[in-house]
Curated annotation (Swiss-Prot):
Its EC number is 7.2.2.20. ATP binds at residues 37-44. Coiled coil: none annotated. It comes from Yersinia enterocolitica serotype O:8 / biotype 1B (strain NCTC 13174 / 8081). It is found in: Cell inner membrane. SMART domains: AAA. This is Zinc import ATP-binding protein ZnuC. It catalyses: Zn(2+)(out) + ATP(in) + H2O(in) = Zn(2+)(in) + ADP(in) + phosphate(in) + H(+)(in).
Amino acid sequence: MSTLVTLNKISVTFGSRRVLNDISLSLRPGRILTLLGPNGAGKSTLVRVVLGLIAPTSGSIIREPGLRIGYVPQKLHLDTTLPLTVSRFMRLKPGVRKADILPALKRVHAAHLLDQPMQKLSGGENQRVLLARALLNRPQLLVLDEPTQGVDVNGQLALYDLIEQLRRELGCAVLMVSHDLHLVMAKTDEVLCLNQHICCSGAPEVVSTHPEFIAMFGQRGAEQLAVYRHHHNHRHDLHGKIILKNSGSRGA
């Protein structure tokens, strides 16, 4: 399997403060890698390194030539006095064709929002629009920084199902930052626990038993993870209702 991005022994220092130390990772097509860690662990800094927004102080980064990246930021700040529809917001992205906007919104089940004001969107609707915008350049790598921030629990479930669906359909790599331990871990292939350095990494069921993971999130967090992965035999619709994968039936 080819590698889209490779980080080799990356460190980042701001002044006298070391934010990241000796980070190595690879991002591959069709795989979801989730970054977990406490506030101040360096997760957003690592995302910016992957995006090429900041250069590492030491170490090397190799990107696939011509790599197309779609990015969903942690927060979007809009002037509430500026009238801006979803359609207009989508067209602010350089190189976007008007004909591409509706298909992108349909892909994330948000076509009905096309003419809605951005300022009137709910948290979940806002994230779907940002995700649609990130898909406009047919990304090989999708980078999601806290994609469910400000979204209610039902909306979080639906968004994670959507991200997994997009990964399957597009075959893209996904780098995701999250705090939603028991939800996101059921949807990821690999976990990297970060606290300036890599505390542990690997498949969720392996990481959940690692001493440093337990020290970071507690035994209860590890138990929640194990139970959730074992029983997660369903997906969720846009309202968070359960749809069993083997029957198509719904539950409350």
